[in-house]
Amino acid sequence: MMFKRNFGKAFIMYSICTLMLFFTSSKDLAWAASTANSPEQTTDEEDTVQAADVLLIYGSNPTEQELQSIEVIVKTITYLQRSIVFLPASQSIDILDNYENIICYNISSDQNELMKSLAMVEKNILFFGGNAVSDYIKDKTYDIEVTYADEVVVSLAYNFTELRSFSNINRLKNTSFLKGEFNYQSGIIEYENNTAALYSAFDNFWYTPVIDLTDEIMSASFAQEAAIWLWPYNGMPHSYSQYIVLNEVYPFYPPESLMEIVDFCINNRLSFIISVMPVYENGDYPAMKRFCEVLRYAQANGGAIILHAPNAVAEQDNTELLWDYLTYATEAYTNFGVYPLALQVPENYLFDETGREVLQRYTTVFCDRNYANSKFNINDKFNTIYKDGHLLIAPDYTIGQEQNVQMETISTAAYISVSQDIEAIKDDIIAVTQVNVVHKSLWDINHRVYAENLYFYSRNGELYFNDKKVSLAYTPFTYEKYEYDSGVFKWIAKDLSSLNKQLAFIVVISSIIFTLFIFAGRYRNRKRFLLPRQKGNKDGVD
């Protein structure tokens, strides 16, 4: 009886404890859930997305061409050393206060709430086309006339400098043209016997009717206008460095020709860069040594060397493999006293996770245009490469067949092909230098390069290899007889050499024997067919 009573008490106590534990756990779980859903609590990823210099708002369901234009905007802002968040209009209304600079790309008229919210915030706003701009102008009560065009053929013209102006024909759809008193205007659009500015600004409101930034003039002009738009002070923004790059120079390039080009740059007091192709094997061959001797001469006379990314493995997703290739290539040059200060890569490295990991070993990165294989993803929402702190050098902008555009508002590289004759290369160099911009030396900037078992950096024009200062003075190489190690072919060659000696001995002996046989045969034939003469008989007949 006592046992049953004690058991009953114990069971009741156990049940009470279990219920208390359940309610406590439920409260903890509810608190955790409410904390996770609280707007005051955000993840690191959300914080990263919201912290940026520029917010780009785009319309719903962008077309392929619109995605390419958005990519141009993101790349341009990135080259200007700014961070950018890109979101659809539906995700942007509640976060407008977090950004000082806002780009509205092709926003349609059904975004009334967004336009009202934009009109209420005093931000630096740039519109690319879209008929929602009329709602924004109305909400701001600007004295600006808006003319809507469903589809129209226009002539675009833009002056990059007083001496560099370009024009072309374009077709615009679903856009608006503005007329009014503006604080700033640049470029000209001619349409249906009317004219408008390509870019117009009134206070903090900027507008362009063109949304196709794949157009050569638009992509180049935006690089200049974006720098002005982001500049918070009066006047023009500060100048960026411009570079001349002899592009994709292979070790088998004739050293005499390369020396002539280098001397041409030196004699004309030009700052220049040589982009060398990677070498993975046979880096000790005399041809490589002669190539590096010319590079050292260029390096000692103000030229800089950069390494071109491996073409053969550019699409690999294996970071370790790419690092290995780059280490082999770097060592092939540093072994001869040549120090590539930067890496040259396709632009798709900027938007690819593996590419960004590879670039972490370089502070300075030169970019190539790569339209065919874009890695840009609209769902990334942020230019992640910005966080890595690289100095990114954009490729120069090409308009038409041969017209390159360099401007001081963005740092660009003019790539000159060396796969043409010497005089054509010199003409290209002269054409680039005639642009009204200053081309600077890569040695004016500090760089850092890491590899598997080495690193080097430049500081104030001096170079340090594994923390030891290195002399960049040019001294000619001495050349010795080189034994080419060809692996299996080497012992085959030795075997053939030995066999050749044996064959030569056999041929000599055979020739001697053959000669003896000839003499013996002639002697026997003479005895057999030619009769000896008899004495006293002149005719040799009895």
Which sequence ranges carry the predicted segments?
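Cytoplasmic C-terminal tails of single-pass
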Residues: 526-542
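A glycine-rich, often tryptophan-bearing local segment used as a flexible ligand/cofactor-contacting loop or short
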Residues: 108-167
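A glycine-centered loop/beta-turn motif at secondary-structure junctions
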Residues: 52-53, 98-99, 124, 143-151, ...
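Active-site beta->alpha N-cap acidic-glycine motif
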Residues: 218-219, 227-297, 301
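Metal-dependent polysaccharide deacetylase catalytic core of the NodB/CE4 family, i.e.
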Residues: 52-59, 126-139, 268-362, 372-377
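Active-site-adjacent pocket scaffolds in enzyme catalytic domains
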Residues: 145-146, 282-286, 295-297, 304, ...
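Catalytic grooves of carbohydrate-active enzymes
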Residues: 233-234, 241-255, 349, 389-448
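C-terminal domain-boundary segment and adjacent tail
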Residues: 233-238, 263-269, 273-282, 364-377, ...
